[in-house]
């Protein structure tokens, strides 16, 4: 609902601003958690954070209560799940962290509000010329039938060039 949207937007802005200033991701999550817990009402949000070193391809995915992340590489699908609570639920953040090396042609996809029924779903046919935005739209069209009625849906796609 409206409260979830506001919590998500607040968390996004908070994380973005602090990370842009050079704050460490783990500490930033702890600060966000403390801020959400001190509210009078129950406020929580999921976090799905991707850090990429664009020179080396080294990447870190940090997840707290978030839906699966899918990495597509040379026709293979790798699913990253994290069985962690959202930020703002418990006093200590227990985010899951995965480190990996991204390569040219990799596609990283996360979603909210939709999860494919297949544990390792294939991507909609796109061809190499499709943009990440076009691929995100095709994914929403394909997977939206599995979404809960009335839930908002979003997909983020990053194609490594």
Regions found by a protein language model. Name each.
Residues 42-47, 80-121, 148-149:
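Acidic loop->beta-strand submotif enriched in PP2C/PPM serine/threonine phosphatases
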Residues 26-30, 102-161:
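C-terminal catalytic subdomain
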Residues 1-6, 113-117:
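Short acidic, Gly/Ser-rich segments with clustered Asp/Glu that frequently serve as metal-coordination loops
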Residues 75-76, 122:
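Residue-level detector of alpha-helical segments with a strong bias toward transmembrane helices
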Residues 3-75, 81, 144-151:
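Catalytic core of PPM/PP2C metal-dependent serine/threonine phosphatase domains
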Residues 33-34, 94-97, 140-142:
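Glycine-rich, charged/polar anion/phosphate-binding loops
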Residues 52, 95, 160:
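Hydrophobic pocket-lining residues within nucleotide cofactor-binding pockets
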């Amino acid at each position: 609902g409206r409260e979830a949207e506001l919590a998500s937007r607040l968390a996004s802005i908070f994380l973005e601003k602090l990370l842009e200033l050079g704050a460490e991701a783990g500490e930033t999550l702890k600060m966000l958690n403390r801020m959400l817990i001190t509210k009078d009402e129950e406020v929580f949000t999921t976090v799905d954070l991707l850090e990429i070193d664009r020179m080396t391809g080294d990447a870190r995915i940090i997840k707290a209560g978030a839906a699966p992340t899918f990495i597509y590489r040379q026709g293979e699908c790798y699913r990253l799940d994290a069985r962690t609570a959202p930020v703002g639920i418990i006093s200590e953040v227990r985010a899951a962290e995965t480190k990996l090396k991204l390569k040219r042609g990799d596609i990283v996809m996360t979603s909210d509000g939709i999860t494919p029924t297949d544990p390792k779903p294939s991507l909609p046919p796109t061809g190499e010329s499709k943009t990440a935005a076009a691929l995100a739209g095709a994914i929403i069209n394909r997977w939206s039938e599995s979404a809960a009625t009335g839930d908002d849906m979003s997909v983020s796609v990053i194609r490594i060039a």
